[in-house]
Amino acid sequence: MRLGPRTAALGLLLLCAAAAGAGKAEELHYPLGERRSDYDREALLGVQEDVDEYVKLGHEEQQKRLQAIIKKIDLDSDGFLTESELSSWIQMSFKHYAMQEAKQQFVEYDKNSDDTVTWDEYNIQMYDRVIDFDENTALDDAEEESFRKLHLKDKKRFEKANQDSGPGLSLEEFIAFEHPEEVDYMTEFVIQEALEEHDKNGDGFVSLEEFLGDYRWDPTANEDPEWILVEKDRFVNDYDKDNDGRLDPQELLPWVVPNNQGIAQEEALHLIDEMDLNGDKKLSEEEILENPDLFLTSEATDYGRQLHDDYFYHDEL
């Protein structure tokens, strides 16, 4: 990206914001396929340093902690892990680590350690300076204008998360800002935000054309690009529940704020498919211990990370 002197500084901010957004997107839409085993490992153990720590555990301690986790996943204590039990556990794990990460971020953003994060503190942490855009004045430069819109959107979300209208966000409000999908009072705001961005004709719905954004069909092409076919399939089969060719506010929600349920269910089914030796569509402790590495390279143990977090392997959860 080439920027003139006037836009260089803000261009760097835009790159930072884009990188941050990409990180969030990757959390929600982790690629499958060739990286399947890596995805499994991170789901159970976490990042590479957690995997390394797991390896350092003695075999007996590894098995002891793994058995403790298996016992907790088995909600009805029947000795088997079903798809539902695995999915519920993985979703709980996602939420636990998201909350832990938000708590760590809160400390970093709270520059004066007063247990609140102000908008200025958020800006300083994100961009090393306080940024203030005029909401009603568009910028001529396309990149500057793109960043202005992104920044104003974050500001509105920050203000919505601030329930008590105090000088900044408490920890709970900061979690609502970072993870609106986990907080009920943010739902309506997120939907309205999506409508403002995508509902071009103002009818209160998002059509397929609006869903696809700026894509224009190429009359010289024999068929649509593969990514368009995928997006159309998602629109029809995943989001448009009443099959009326448009997304109403409630149908918008799983698109704009996807939760982890689908990811967790897919991972649970993957584990059962790979580890179920007798074809009963569930996993016994024996089947898991027959191939523990696969289980420890999956979301079920956050890629083994849970073996180092006593929140998961201690008796009281």
UniProtKB/Swiss-Prot annotation:
Ca(2+) 2 binds at residues 110, 112, 114, 116, 121. It is found in: Endoplasmic reticulum lumen. Ca(2+) 3 binds at residues 164, 173. Its main location: endoplasmic reticulum. The keyword Transport does not apply. GO terms for molecular function: calcium ion binding. Residues 61-96, 97-132, 150-185, 186-221, 227-262, 263-298 form the EF-hand domain. Ca(2+) 1 binds at residues 74, 76, 78, 85. Residues 1-22 form the signal peptide. One of its GO terms (cellular component) is endoplasmic reticulum lumen. Ubiquitous. It comes from the Eukaryota. Not known. Binds calcium. This is Reticulocalbin-2. It comes from Homo sapiens (Human). The gene is RCN2.
